[in-house]
Amino acid sequence: MILLCALWMGLTRAMAQQSTPSVVHPNVGTSSTSDQLSIKLVNKHINYGGSQEQYRDAYINSPKSANIHPDGSKYYVNSLEGCATVVYDMKTHKRIKVIHYKFEDEKDAALWSKPSEFYPFTHYTEHLNTFMGKPVESTFSHGGRYLWIPFYRRTYDINAQDPSAIAVIDTRTDEIVKLMETGPLPKMVACSHDGRHVAITHWGNNTVGIVNVASLNPDEWYHEKLLVVDYVLPLNFSLTQQIDRDNKSGYCLRGTVFTPDDKYLLVGCMGGNGGIAVIDMSTQKYMGRVLGMMANVRHLVIRDGYLYLSINKAGYVQRIKLDKFMQAAKNINGKTTTLSGWENCQVGAGARTIEISPSGHFVFAACNLASKLYVVDTRTMKVVTNIDVDSYPVGLDISNDGRFVIVTSQGRGNSGGNAVNIYEVEYTEPEPVMENTDGAAVLNMLKDDPSKQQASVEKDNIATVLEHDGDSLLLYIGAGLLAAVAVVAFLMRRRKGAQIRN
């Protein structure tokens, strides 16, 4: 019996080791080169045992995602278990601010938007707005003016079954300017290209929230619609014993992207029988799910007429022509349709976040189980190189000039994680600088189409500048005064010259 127990314990340990790959901690200076590009690890922010002091940052605690500001000046790292977002200078990589998510009912009441009817509390009744928030993903709106950061859950809601929340940061000051309710367990958030809508995807119960943000004034934003993907997942879990909400959460809605014309919203389904949910934004109605790609769809990106997917478990990047995908989506007869013709490229196991270089030629994929950053050439759909990342990478962003890639790594159990890796990329063929399209259109409303202008945008120009950008107004006034002085001086000299000639 003792021998059998020993054998069983040994087998259990072996299986555990096999399920969690060995931890990797590459040194700064690690590099990889191919004919198309070279990539080098140039900096880190880490907080694990044995960390080099020069790279240690105590605020890095299970970093979920990173977002580089569209102007390239700084980047934001969402520290999920730290209940904070850490802000770094893009040039020096020094920490410049920590945004903490600790709220109290009365103290922070003014930050909350007007509640909607979409998100009722069904389990908790007291001190609902006293909590700490666990930041997940984020997206910019209004040309980079605001950063939207959903919370995995409110800390008292141990099983993420009541409404969570989303914080909005003014990136000029890096202060919280608005809090809004969400559905349970929001993970992904996306802004439409025209800047009018923010979509919040609720992993926790198969729903997607739509927020109207067409105004420049955060006080005028409001919840517009709550959409259901097939069915609302019933939530009635324990209030004292925590369960695993990262699994068995219905369709586990994740990757979220608006089509370039903003007519449709696509949402990846990591769970259930998978696929991509399609929402018609003109009618704000759920159309059904497109199947046919590999299971376990994690992240979605649209670029140059293609829809790209990361396939988590199998470790693939897939793509298909967006027109072909939308044709299938529009012909859904019932709840699902199956689409064939996907192009595949195998990368590392556990493909999570993907982003594409400014030229559209390269896909960068954070591969969790492989502890690597993979690069795929979209012209051939083949891997061109890969490089080690601190275990286990999940989040990723690329700068608008393609020069820097930032990767965040969470742990698996008590292993790995607590790391942010910064890579510098040099391309054989120069990359263009990507145009800022983060909801920028809302800042340039069409003057010849009054129906598309919002009340808050139709204010007098000077009043609007004063309200939203006082520094710019002072510059305008100063320039005007200098011009006036110059004109007066010119006229006086001209008059004096005329008198002499006479």
Regions found by a protein language model. Give the residues of each.
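Bacterial N-terminal signal peptides
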Residues: 1-10
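Predominantly soluble domains enriched in secretory-pathway, periplasmic, or organellar proteins
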Residues: 17-471, 482-487, 500-502
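Sec/Tat signal peptide C-region and signal peptidase I cleavage site
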Residues: 12-15
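A cross-kingdom C-terminal cell-surface attachment/processing module
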Residues: 476-493
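Membrane-proximal cytoplasmic juxtamembrane segment of single-pass cell-surface glycoproteins
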Residues: 495-498
